[in-house]
Amino acid sequence: RLPYRTNSLVVNLLQNRILNITEEFRRGTFTQRCSQLSFGILCLFLLECSITGGGRYWEAGPVSVRILLGGLAAVLALPELFRHLGAYLKKPAVWLTLAFVAWLAFCAWRGVRAENRMDVLLTDIKGFMWLFLVPVLVATVRSRQRLRVLLSWVLAGAVIQAALILAVNAAVVLMDDPAPLCRWLNEHTVGIVDVVSARLVRVFFKSSPYMIVGCVVALFRQARAPKLRWRYVLAVALLFNALLLSYTRSLYGALGLTALVSIVAVLVLCPEGRKRTLAFLLAAVVCFGVLVTVQEFALEGSYLSFAVSRTIGKEVPTSWASQLRSQLRGEDPGDSPDDGEMDSQRSYIEVTEKSDQLRQETKDSLNVYIQRSPIIGCGLGASAANRDKGVDEYFYLDMLARTGVVGLLLYMLPFGYVVVWCLRRRELLRECPEGAAVVCGLCTFWIVTWFNPWMNAVLGIAWYAVTLSVPQALEEQNA
């Protein structure tokens, strides 16, 4: 009788648990628990996005840590979504996203019918599948407190990424054989590590835009602080340094334009903190200069001058830190380092020029598709002929070629809605400037995605989803 009694106990236990869950669901406590768990996993998800690039450092078949976290967050958000499904479907951020998804399905059908590249078509679909994060975040980030917590995780991830970039830079310069480290980072899509010369290394993590987002979050938080917060100053200086080591023109441009938009927004929303904001910016730039100078002395690389050289495509004199180092060592403080070092840098700049030529060919090829069907596009899978792997890089031209003007406008409409909402509800943004920080942070992705396809992949779409949750988070607090 013992097995029978044991089975009865198990059955009774399961029945009681099911009844408890049903009662909790009826009262809303079960939904609340799931929402809390979903939010916690989303924090880990965005932390991971802001550090590890492609997120392929650990995989079990097709499943990576990022896919696992995103899937769990979505499943746990389902009770909240189903409980108030009608209300969420009326949210402009949700139904505008669904309208774009419907158009995307139409473009996929057109791509199949036109016999476009099937591998590229599937890649397009996989990238935009992350749009499921929009309803998940809208349903989960339902208060200002949760929005602030989420941004704290993103800021922490951005600072960790910056520290890793500086560590990788120093390790590659100092190691006798840095090839295994570079190969591991490249193969696991964390980022690109190119050895420019014996003293210069280009370290570009695919999560780099999140470092600009981190700068924006720190700026807005400092604006509301009663005094200068040195932890934010040092964090921004570290982020600036890591962005410098990327030697990536699109990131430099995005940093400049995002800084302009963010500073204007801060001065408008937080007028009482203008002096502290200006002092914060000055202190961050000074700390950044000190940090770069120390690195140039220690690692003997002329980072600033090479960054300018790669940006403008012309050789410039070495930075003052490198010249001062030469003087202190009794060396010839000329405007150039040794010939071998400069030859390596010139060769890398020539590679950049060849890359620009390939980019121009890509644009010309995509323009052929755009001219063929500018309104509705040529369907998913349409790809530049000169790109064997189908990776075209130019997001806006990709969208116009594959989904047309209609598709691009539908994709950007939710962002337009949030911008209009922010302009109309400025009083809520003054109470919670972090909402404006999220929107300014998304400007970074809209800028850098001109050169790299961030906005049709998880890193850009994840932040897009955070942005679309801002009205819900700020209005819910006011309800």
Residue ranges: model-predicted function:
Residues V94-A102, N116-T140, V149-A158, A162:
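Aromatic-anchored transmembrane helix interface
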Residues V266-E350, V368-R372:
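A membrane-periplasm/extracellular boundary helix in multi-pass inner-membrane enzymes
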Residues R148-C182, A198-C270, Y417:
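Alpha-helical transmembrane segments of multi-pass inner-membrane proteins
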Residues R1-A108, V112, Q145, S152, ...:
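Transmembrane signal-anchor hairpin modules in multi-pass inner-membrane enzymes, especially those
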Residues A259-L260, A437-A479:
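Transmembrane alpha-helices of multi-pass inner-membrane enzymes
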Residues S336-V405:
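Long extracytoplasmic/lumenal interhelical loops at the membrane interface
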Residues S50-Y57, R183-V201, G379-D398:
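Juxtamembrane membrane-water interface segments that cap and precede transmembrane helices
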Residues T403-W446:
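Hydrophobic transmembrane alpha-helices and their immediate junctions
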